[in-house]
């Protein structure tokens, strides 16, 4: 009998796992970019395959959502945001509107406990209610100055059909005091469904928040609207930053009587027409196909970050980190007093080194990852000279007294053991230094194969790779070769790939031997000269 119970238990677990992602098999319609793929952000994604009600909220709900607004505001017009009107029935989220008396309504709402930030794709599958109320899937920053409306629909339109047949796709930028509101206007913000009311069926509503100045809207997997820089913040409410802040996700319904007709108490009491049904919500980040640029603790073994501003260029395959990137799966634990600059591409600077994060304060960068040994490469430098920059990892000093001249970029790497699922990197400045300044963080798991290869080449995992490490492209060059200094004429240079295979052999004819990199795929190689080896990283 016990075996039968166990069998039923495992079947239950299996069914729960299968149902956990109701969107399986539905591709993300947005393009993540060359060499990139979509990675699910589980902490803000939900199939709602559990029961939840006020006073009975399971961890599946409370770990991700709260049934209230981001602050104490109770809603627009005749709205009263109220927790009992947000519930789940085992397969869907219900956002309900019910009569509150005196012409007002109790309205359901949920707000994410975890924030999202571009680049990110977010989508729900939902069916709006048959009411004059607004049904909305949107995002809002803590300071309430930046809002993205992925969808805002009105299920019925008393006296006409115009609103019922159109879906509002928009965004807002605000000044809070004195209150000033901008949102784009015109027919392009109201997507027409060919005459069919949106309330008649479930639809998928998505938005790719690509960067601070680009929004792509999708309905049922089709791109229906793109918003670019000219429309994002033409009145400069945000001081030129665009939609750049980390933001909460909100799903709610609203009785917007400040500009819409009010729902009657009788209409609100009709349970067949007063529920905004949400089947699921899914959120994705673009990450490198190879694992480079990945940012979650899902077994990825490589994480590549290009540090800069919210809008500066990002090296292909890398993920942006700005001075406002707060630690979630990755980022700064404290963003106070961290600056960012884009120095431009003059003097041959490439997109890795043109932009930086910097600070005079000690700051921690964290990365969620699986336990193991990792090689961490950091690129230091700026258009100004920097002194005595230091890095510690997992509480151990790894790099000290790193100095760079004006316009010089230096890469240093080290290995570190992680046993708590999170890598902590501490950046600081020693005596005589003003700020630390970095352009890149590259984290790669060290496998047993790579350890054996290093040992075979006369290196150990503990050996620091300092001036003997090459990076291609060179920060100030774009030629398709690297130069190996102090080469012995008549000897041979052998290049191995990370699997230990010989990929090139060159006879040395110059003390500064040039090696062509034509045909080299991106990755890590090892240059061997007279028994001495060094890394070559081709990007």
Curated annotation (Swiss-Prot):
Keywords: Glycosidase, Hydrolase, Secreted, Signal. Proteolytically cleaved into mature beta-agarase A catalytic chain (AgaAc). Substrate binds at residues 73, 82-92, 96-98, 144, 176, 271. One of its GO terms (biological process) is carbohydrate metabolic process. GO terms for cellular component: extracellular region. The keyword Secreted applies. It is an enzyme of class 3 (hydrolase). The active site is at residues 147, 152. Monomer. This is Beta-agarase A. It comes from Zobellia galactanivorans (strain DSM 12802 / CCUG 47099 / CIP 106680 / NCIMB 13871 / Dsij). The gene is agaA.
